[in-house]
Design a protein with these regions (language model features):
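Collagenous Gly-X-Y triple-helix signature in extracellular proteins
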Residues: 1-218
């Protein structure tokens, strides 16, 4: 009710969090990433965006091949993994999760257009977690997304999975990069980086690749 009232930011603050027990028994904390940041497919502003404070215990690759053709909307994670993650949220949470429209980049030899996806949960973009398109010697193309204020430093981006250090994917292809085969990710120390031909990788330099998602309510 508060989320839908338009007054959520008078009751809560960025960083406030709630604990959710998934249907699988996995326990995750979700923190307020920002207020009035995201929009529905119809362009209506959504009151609250939440971000996972831990990465999910089951990680993996972002795509079935080393390719960024089609971008995040066409990647294996979004098509084959994300639906089961959303369905594992408790019903009372699924009932208040609001579909958001998210921008990303489809990067191939044909260009790097902005493409959209409409989902109840999603991978964050590099720009949403660092607020820039150039970082630590790597870069991505501007998809129009903006920083969530919960991400203010490398430390704020560090996530654990199964109680151990991990790296986690963003939905942003590395670019310019003429192999068209890599996504940006958050390293175990919280730095946003990329690597060569990584889209089908399940580990990065010995560290497991995992999923840390955002979603909207209200």
């Amino acid at each position: 009710a508060i989320a839908k009232s338009g007054m959520a930011n008078q009751y809560w603050s960025v960083g406030d969090y709630h604990t959710i027990t998934m249907k699988t028994g996995e326990v995750i904390d979700v923190a307020i990433g920002d207020f009035n940041h995201d929009v529905t497919p119809g362009g209506v502003t959504i009151p609250v965006t939440l971000v996972m404070k831990q990465a999910l215990k089951d990680g993996g690759r972002i795509h079935s091949s080393t390719s960024t053709v089609g971008g995040y909307p066409e990647c294996e994670f979004r098509k084959n993994v994300l639906p089961s993650i959303v369905s594992n949220f408790p019903d009372e949470w699924q009932n208040i999760m609001t579909t958001a429209r998210k921008n990303s980049i489809a990067y191939s030899s044909s260009g790097h257009p902005i493409v959209t996806s409409d989902d109840k949960a999603w991978m964050l973009s590099a720009q949403e977690v660092i607020g820039a398109t150039s970082f630590n010697g790597y870069s991505c193309y501007d998809d129009g997304s903006t920083l969530y204020p919960i991400f203010s430093s490398n430390e704020s981006r560090i996530r654990m999975s199964n109680g151990a250090d991990c790296a986690w994917w963003t939905r942003s292809p590395r670019g310019p990069y003429t192999q068209y085969s890599s996504y940006c990710y958050v390293r175990a120390d919280g730095a946003v980086v990329s690597s060569d031909n990584n889209a089908a990788s399940t580990t990065m330099f010995g560290v497991p690749m995992t999923y840390c998602l955002g979603f909207c309510v209200g």
